Design a protein with these regions (language model features):
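Glycine-rich, small/acidic residue-mixed loop/short-helix segments
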Residues: 48, 52, 156, 161-168, ...
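Short, conserved charged micro-motifs
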Residues: 15-20, 71-76, 105-106, 125-129, ...
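Short, intrinsically disordered, mixed-charge
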Residues: 21-29, 77-85, 186, 210-213
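Anionic-ligand-binding alpha/beta catalytic cores of soluble enzymes and soluble regulatory domains
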Residues: 120-193
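Acidic, low-complexity central loop/insert segments
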Residues: 1-3, 7-10, 53-147, 210
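Acidic, proline/glycine-enriched N-terminal capping motif
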Residues: 1-49, 58-59
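Glycine-centered loop/turn motifs
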Residues: 33-36, 77, 108-111, 144, ...
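Short amphipathic alpha-helix segments
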Residues: 37-45, 101-107, 201-213
Length: 252
């Protein structure tokens, strides 16, 4: 079991489901108890406030799992600012996050694809022992999973990180940021995209060079693998140079 630096916001009450359905980018109403779904909390301009996993814990209670513990308070504050007359409580929780590689470990646990292997994420209300989360970095990077503070921040468009494929429903009702997200989808592409890079060695900040032109920078790296945002015209299997070494692109 590996500890995670996650944040938790509990949203509960008679209007919790309807409120979250109007606030986040993916469908909430169809969630069963114990089921989780990836979503985003966005600004009106379609920028990311917080990547989320929305977990239904009871009929009228949900837990929003944020990428880092530092995102819990901003997430709660953004939701409270939009609550108005909705009958729901919005409370950050000081819980401990964990991921178990392999079998399901807890009564409420949800599967995660963040590490490219079978894994289940859960939380506990009291501290418990677990391995250091840095042990998961090679798996995360090789799987092409973006992390807040590395590949994700409030300047990134969801489509640049590939989150439009996993965190957004284009058929649900309105939510903040829906219009710019839909316009970008109609346009057909973004100018840069997150890619996996097969490279002997790299460091965050290294330039990614293609046809003698800087087309991106490395955001995360471990031995043999890296992530970075690269101009969209570079082919998914293109050969680039990173830190003086030849490297090959892969889609994230």
């Amino acid at each position: 079991m590996v500890r995670l630096d996650r944040g938790y916001v509990e949203v509960s009450g008679a209007d919790a489901e309807d409120f979250l359905e109007r606030m986040v980018s993916n469908e909430v109403a169809s969630l069963e108890r114990g089921e989780a779904r990836s979503a985003l909390l966005l600004t009106a301009k379609g920028r990311i406030i917080s990547p989320l996993r929305v977990v239904r814990t009871e009929a009228d209670s949900f837990v929003l799992v944020t990428d880092t513990s530092a995102l819990a308070e901003p997430t709660a504050a953004s939701l409270r600012a939009a609550r108005f007359a909705a009958k729901c409580e919005i409370d950050p929780r000081a819980w401990e996050g964990f991921v178990q590689l392999g079998s399901e470990p807890e009564p409420i646990a949800f599967p995660t694809n963040d590490y490219g292997v079978e894994a289940w994420e859960s939380w506990r209300e009291a501290p418990a022992e677990g391995a250091d989360p840095q042990e998961l970095e090679p798996l995360r990077i090789e799987a092409g999973t973006p992390a807040w503070g590395k590949e994700l921040d409030d300047s990134i468009l969801p489509a640049e990180a590939g989150l439009d494929r996993t965190h957004i429903s284009f058929t649900k009702g309105c939510f903040p940021g829906q219009e710019p997200i839909a316009r970008l989808r109609h346009r057909g592409h973004v100018n840069r995209r997150l890619r996996r890079i097969e490279v002997p060695a790299a460091q965050p900040g290294d330039e990614i060079v293609w046809n003698d032109k800087v087309v991106g920078r490395v955001t995360s790296a471990v031995e043999g693998h890296a992530l970075g945002y690269v101009r969209s015209e570079v082919p998914d299997d293109g050969v680039v140079t990173v830190g003086g070494s030849q490297a090959r692109m892969r889609p994230a």
